[in-house]
Protein backbone atom coordinates (compact mmCIF):
# COMPACT_ATOMS: atom_id res chain seq x y z
CA UNK A 1 0.00 0.00 0.00
CA UNK A 2 1.63 3.20 -1.17
CA UNK A 3 0.76 6.54 0.38
CA UNK A 4 -0.62 9.09 -2.09
CA UNK A 5 2.39 11.28 -1.37
CA UNK A 6 5.49 10.84 0.75
CA UNK A 7 4.66 11.52 4.39
CA UNK A 8 5.91 14.68 6.10
CA UNK A 9 7.56 14.55 9.50
CA UNK A 10 7.56 16.38 12.80
CA UNK A 11 8.28 15.87 16.50
CA UNK A 12 5.49 14.86 18.86
CA UNK A 13 4.61 17.42 21.52
CA UNK A 14 1.45 15.87 22.96
CA UNK A 15 -1.65 13.83 22.17
CA UNK A 16 -4.90 14.98 23.78
CA UNK A 17 -8.69 14.63 23.55
CA UNK A 18 -7.91 11.20 22.00
CA UNK A 19 -8.07 12.47 18.42
CA UNK A 20 -5.78 15.52 18.44
CA UNK A 21 -1.99 15.73 18.39
CA UNK A 22 0.36 18.71 18.51
CA UNK A 23 3.67 18.40 16.67
CA UNK A 24 6.67 20.61 15.96
CA UNK A 25 7.67 20.89 12.30
CA UNK A 26 11.25 21.12 10.99
CA UNK A 27 10.87 24.92 10.66
CA UNK A 28 10.07 25.04 14.44
CA UNK A 29 6.42 25.98 13.87
CA UNK A 30 3.70 23.94 15.58
CA UNK A 31 0.71 22.21 14.04
CA UNK A 32 -2.31 20.26 15.27
CA UNK A 33 -2.98 17.05 13.36
CA UNK A 34 -5.70 14.40 13.55
CA UNK A 35 -5.09 11.09 15.33
CA UNK A 36 -7.36 8.31 13.98
CA UNK A 37 -6.79 6.09 17.00
CA UNK A 38 -9.02 6.05 20.07
CA UNK A 39 -7.00 3.39 21.90
CA UNK A 40 -4.51 3.70 24.73
CA UNK A 41 -1.56 3.84 22.26
CA UNK A 42 0.78 2.68 25.04
CA UNK A 43 4.38 3.24 23.98
CA UNK A 44 3.30 4.77 20.65
CA UNK A 45 2.84 8.41 21.60
CA UNK A 46 5.82 9.51 23.67
CA UNK A 47 6.68 13.22 23.48
CA UNK A 48 9.86 13.66 21.45
CA UNK A 49 9.10 10.79 19.07
CA UNK A 50 9.35 11.45 15.36
CA UNK A 51 5.93 11.32 13.71
CA UNK A 52 4.98 11.10 10.05
CA UNK A 53 1.71 12.52 8.74
CA UNK A 54 -0.31 12.56 5.54
CA UNK A 55 -2.31 15.45 4.06
CA UNK A 56 -5.89 15.05 2.89
CA UNK A 57 -7.12 16.53 -0.37
CA UNK A 58 -10.44 17.29 1.36
CA UNK A 59 -10.30 21.04 1.86
CA UNK A 60 -13.32 20.95 4.21
CA UNK A 61 -11.48 19.06 6.94
CA UNK A 62 -10.70 21.15 10.01
CA UNK A 63 -7.48 19.17 10.53
CA UNK A 64 -6.27 18.11 7.05
CA UNK A 65 -3.19 16.27 8.36
CA UNK A 66 -3.42 12.73 9.75
CA UNK A 67 -0.88 11.03 12.00
CA UNK A 68 0.28 7.85 10.25
CA UNK A 69 3.57 6.61 11.73
CA UNK A 70 5.58 7.03 14.90
CA UNK A 71 9.29 6.24 15.39
CA UNK A 72 10.31 5.39 18.96
CA UNK A 73 13.56 6.09 20.79
CA UNK A 74 14.53 2.47 20.01
CA UNK A 75 14.03 3.19 16.29
CA UNK A 76 10.91 1.04 16.05
CA UNK A 77 8.33 2.14 13.49
CA UNK A 78 4.64 1.99 14.44
CA UNK A 79 1.55 2.69 12.37
CA UNK A 80 -0.90 4.49 14.66
CA UNK A 81 -3.61 5.02 12.04
CA UNK A 82 -5.93 2.08 12.71
CA UNK A 83 -7.70 2.56 9.37
CA UNK A 84 -4.58 1.24 7.62
CA UNK A 85 -4.85 -2.26 9.11
CA UNK A 86 -7.93 -3.18 7.06
CA UNK A 87 -6.46 -1.63 3.92
CA UNK A 88 -3.27 -3.64 4.31
CA UNK A 89 -5.08 -6.94 4.85
CA UNK A 90 -7.42 -6.37 1.90
CA UNK A 91 -4.44 -5.63 -0.35
CA UNK A 92 -2.56 -8.70 0.87
CA UNK A 93 -5.56 -10.98 0.26
CA UNK A 94 -6.13 -9.58 -3.24
CA UNK A 95 -2.43 -10.09 -4.04
CA UNK A 96 -2.61 -13.71 -2.77
CA UNK A 97 -0.04 -13.01 -0.04
CA UNK A 98 -1.94 -14.67 2.82
CA UNK A 99 -1.45 -18.41 2.30
CA UNK A 100 -4.49 -19.37 4.35
CA UNK A 101 -6.83 -17.23 2.22
CA UNK A 102 -5.64 -17.66 -1.37
CA UNK A 103 -8.54 -19.78 -2.65
CA UNK A 104 -11.31 -17.22 -2.37
CA UNK A 105 -12.61 -15.46 -5.49
CA UNK A 106 -14.74 -12.60 -4.17
CA UNK A 107 -13.99 -10.00 -1.49
CA UNK A 108 -16.36 -7.52 0.13
CA UNK A 109 -15.90 -5.17 3.08
CA UNK A 110 -18.20 -3.93 5.86
CA UNK A 111 -20.82 -6.64 5.34
CA UNK A 112 -23.62 -6.86 7.93
CA UNK A 113 -23.69 -10.11 9.88
CA UNK A 114 -24.33 -11.71 13.25
CA UNK A 115 -27.01 -11.66 15.92
CA UNK A 116 -25.55 -8.50 17.49
CA UNK A 117 -25.93 -6.48 14.27
CA UNK A 118 -22.24 -6.12 13.47
CA UNK A 119 -20.33 -5.41 10.27
CA UNK A 120 -17.50 -7.76 9.36
CA UNK A 121 -14.29 -6.11 8.16
CA UNK A 122 -13.74 -8.54 5.26
CA UNK A 123 -16.05 -11.13 3.71
CA UNK A 124 -14.69 -13.74 1.29
CA UNK A 125 -16.59 -16.22 -0.84
CA UNK A 126 -15.93 -18.83 -3.51
CA UNK A 127 -17.68 -21.82 -5.04
CA UNK A 128 -17.24 -25.04 -3.07
CA UNK A 129 -15.87 -23.18 -0.01
CA UNK A 130 -17.63 -21.99 3.15
CA UNK A 131 -18.05 -18.23 3.39
CA UNK A 132 -15.17 -16.60 5.28
CA UNK A 133 -15.66 -13.80 7.82
CA UNK A 134 -12.52 -11.86 8.83
CA UNK A 135 -12.22 -9.43 11.73
CA UNK A 136 -9.01 -7.35 11.60
CA UNK A 137 -7.26 -5.99 14.69
CA UNK A 138 -4.10 -3.88 14.71
CA UNK A 139 -1.40 -4.80 17.25
CA UNK A 140 0.96 -2.09 18.53
CA UNK A 141 1.50 -2.88 22.24
CA UNK A 142 5.05 -4.14 22.89
CA UNK A 143 6.89 -5.20 26.03
CA UNK A 144 10.67 -5.19 26.48
CA UNK A 145 11.12 -8.79 25.30
CA UNK A 146 9.64 -8.34 21.83
CA UNK A 147 6.27 -9.71 22.91
CA UNK A 148 3.29 -7.97 21.35
CA UNK A 149 -0.14 -7.89 22.99
CA UNK A 150 -3.75 -7.27 22.07
CA UNK A 151 -5.77 -5.44 23.27
CA UNK A 152 -4.03 -2.42 24.80
CA UNK A 153 -7.16 -1.51 26.79
CA UNK A 154 -10.48 -3.13 27.68
CA UNK A 155 -12.46 -3.50 24.46
CA UNK A 156 -16.18 -4.21 24.73
CA UNK A 157 -16.40 -3.80 20.95
CA UNK A 158 -13.71 -6.44 20.49
CA UNK A 159 -15.55 -8.76 22.88
CA UNK A 160 -18.68 -8.36 20.76
CA UNK A 161 -16.73 -9.26 17.61
CA UNK A 162 -15.44 -12.44 19.25
CA UNK A 163 -18.97 -13.50 20.15
CA UNK A 164 -20.03 -12.92 16.55
CA UNK A 165 -17.07 -14.88 15.13
CA UNK A 166 -17.76 -17.74 17.53
CA UNK A 167 -21.34 -17.94 16.31
CA UNK A 168 -20.15 -17.97 12.68
CA UNK A 169 -17.75 -20.85 13.38
CA UNK A 170 -20.39 -22.81 15.27
CA UNK A 171 -22.65 -22.50 12.21
CA UNK A 172 -20.05 -24.20 10.02
CA UNK A 173 -18.65 -21.16 8.24
CA UNK A 174 -15.05 -19.95 8.34
CA UNK A 175 -14.30 -17.29 10.96
CA UNK A 176 -10.92 -15.57 11.15
CA UNK A 177 -9.45 -13.18 13.70
CA UNK A 178 -6.62 -11.43 11.85
CA UNK A 179 -3.97 -9.62 13.89
CA UNK A 180 -2.18 -7.04 11.72
CA UNK A 181 1.05 -6.28 13.58
CA UNK A 182 1.90 -2.63 12.94
CA UNK A 183 4.97 -2.33 15.20
CA UNK A 184 8.40 -3.25 13.83
CA UNK A 185 9.68 -4.32 17.27
CA UNK A 186 7.09 -7.05 17.83
CA UNK A 187 8.35 -10.61 17.29
CA UNK A 188 5.35 -12.62 18.53
CA UNK A 189 1.80 -11.93 19.69
CA UNK A 190 -0.32 -13.00 22.63
CA UNK A 191 -3.54 -11.89 24.30
CA UNK A 192 -3.26 -9.28 27.06
CA UNK A 193 -5.30 -11.17 29.66
CA UNK A 194 -3.78 -8.84 32.28
CA UNK A 195 -5.57 -5.97 30.53
CA UNK A 196 -8.83 -7.55 29.36
CA UNK A 197 -9.56 -10.90 31.01
CA UNK A 198 -12.99 -11.12 29.37
CA UNK A 199 -11.48 -10.79 25.89
CA UNK A 200 -9.03 -13.58 26.75
CA UNK A 201 -11.84 -15.87 27.93
CA UNK A 202 -13.97 -15.16 24.87
CA UNK A 203 -11.05 -15.89 22.54
CA UNK A 204 -10.44 -19.23 24.25
CA UNK A 205 -14.08 -20.10 23.59
CA UNK A 206 -13.81 -18.83 20.01
CA UNK A 207 -10.77 -20.97 19.25
CA UNK A 208 -12.45 -24.03 20.76
CA UNK A 209 -15.43 -23.33 18.48
CA UNK A 210 -13.22 -23.27 15.39
CA UNK A 211 -12.24 -19.61 14.94
CA UNK A 212 -8.87 -19.31 13.18
CA UNK A 213 -6.29 -16.79 14.43
CA UNK A 214 -3.84 -15.37 11.89
CA UNK A 215 -0.99 -13.01 12.75
CA UNK A 216 0.99 -11.11 10.11
CA UNK A 217 3.41 -8.20 10.39
CA UNK A 218 3.76 -5.18 8.13
CA UNK A 219 6.84 -3.25 7.09
CA UNK A 220 6.32 0.51 7.19
CA UNK A 221 8.05 3.54 5.69
CA UNK A 222 7.10 7.15 4.81
CA UNK A 223 6.29 5.99 1.27
CA UNK A 224 4.51 2.66 1.69
CA UNK A 225 3.31 -0.14 3.96
CA UNK A 226 3.11 -3.84 3.17
CA UNK A 227 2.33 -7.08 5.01
CA UNK A 228 5.48 -9.17 4.73
CA UNK A 229 5.67 -11.99 7.29
CA UNK A 230 3.71 -14.32 9.51
CA UNK A 231 4.39 -14.10 13.26
CA UNK A 232 3.87 -16.70 16.00
CA UNK A 233 0.71 -16.40 18.05
CA UNK A 234 -0.04 -17.93 21.44
CA UNK A 235 -3.11 -17.44 23.57
UniProtKB/Swiss-Prot annotation:
Signal peptide: none
GO molecular function: DNA binding
Entry protein name: Sugar fermentation stimulation protein homolog
CDD domains: SfsA-like_bacterial (cd22359)
Listed NCBIfam families: sfsA
A Pfam family: SfsA
Tree of life domain: Bacteria
Entry similarity comment: Belongs to the SfsA family.
HAMAP family for the chain: SfsA
Amino acid sequence: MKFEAKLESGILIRRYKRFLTDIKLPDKSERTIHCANSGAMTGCAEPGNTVFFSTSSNLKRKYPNSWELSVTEHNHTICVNTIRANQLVVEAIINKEIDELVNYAELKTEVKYGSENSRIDIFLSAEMLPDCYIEVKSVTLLDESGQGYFPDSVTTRGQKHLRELTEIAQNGQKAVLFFAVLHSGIEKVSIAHHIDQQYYSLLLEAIESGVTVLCYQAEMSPTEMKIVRKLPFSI
